[in-house]
Amino acid sequence: MSTDIDFLYRPGFHFTPAKNWMNDPNGLVFHKGEYHLFYQHNPFGTKWGHMSWGHAVSTDLLNWKHLDIAISEDADGAIFSGSAVSIGDEIVAIYTRHTETNQTQCIATSKDNGRTFTKFESNPVLDLDMADFRDPKVFRYEDQWIMAVVKPHEHVCVFYKSIDLIKWEFLSEFGPAAAIGGVWECPDLFPLTYNGEELWVLLISLNPGAINNGTGTQYFVGSFDGVTFRPKYPIEKPRWLDHGRDNYAGATFNDAPDGRRIFIGWMANWQDLGSHPATSWTNAMTIPRELGLTKIGEEIVLTQQPLCSPTYELIIDTTKKHRSGLTGFVELGYDPSTQKIFVDNYTADVKPVNNRIHLKVLVDQSSVELYTSDGVSWITMAVFPQAGVTRALSDFG
């Protein structure tokens, strides 16, 4: 049942579950004219537990239709994170089955556009007899399927190949590398083009130990030949997809139209879950973002552009300190002494052009996403202001 507090905090253009708990986006795939967003879901309450796959579909990535639970927890285990692929008329989900002592990779098939799934009777399809081995991302590479899956505590992403999604053959490993202060989770690997050159981007989520002292997602730019991922540059420090505290476990859509690479993340973090108000639903997704590449100095870096218009835009003179705010909400701006943009205590490096920075802000009830117009630097935060706050942007020096 909807309440006043639900109305106050439920975003208008970010995805939220109809009710109960949600975390990682799963099984992102475009199939027969619909974007499918599956997600980690507790059907029975607003706290984490009974992990199953919730489900929603959209034709534009902003307006979503809630559907029934797609894959439910059963006596064999909980349904943890994974991915989905489109094969003809079918959607095949590849997910981690979790028990207290073992995590294995399993598959389930839908013949009705993702509305219902049948679990493969010979699951699991990949079992290393490990307590922590999870989050398979599967995609097509030439004439075979590739799986990226992590050994979280070893800080390793493992690659496998398969012809039929059932029999998997080991290919290679990547890691440990860059940030290893927490467990590795939710890998994704995909191609993007820069100036006619195909490059591959590997995403690895980290919990905790990210730049914001909590959860976050690092990325690597490199090459992939169907066997091995090789970074393009020496790995001297992590590169972060987002500098805020609330963008974790994100993934990209398989088979998005026109070859677009579209990302959605979980707009929360594991260190600060107690701050969510007592609504009938818990947590939201980030705004969908189209990914690309650009060059900063001598390195090629990731860019993100939202699939909606900004709420506010700021042109900042970088010779001066600039502070703006949403009254009683958050403070944001630019500090010329550090050359960083900030939202409250979270910062991101920027490179001014002609002493100017063009910032854009998405504000949606209980979230703020600040980003540079080139899409290189982002700060994402879930925030829960008190009732009566106007959420209007104002300058205060």
Predicted regions and their residues:
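Surface loop/turn signatures of beta-propeller and other carbohydrate-active proteins
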Residues: 1-26, 45-48, 62-86, 114-140, ...
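Structural WD40 beta-propeller signal
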Residues: 31, 87, 139-141, 190-192, ...
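Short glycine/acidic-enriched loop and turn motifs that connect beta-strands
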Residues: 42-46, 98-101, 152-155, 207-210, ...
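Beta-propeller blade signature
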Residues: 52-60, 105-113, 159-165, 215-226, ...
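Carboxylate/His-rich catalytic cores and anion/metal-binding grooves
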Residues: 81, 90-125
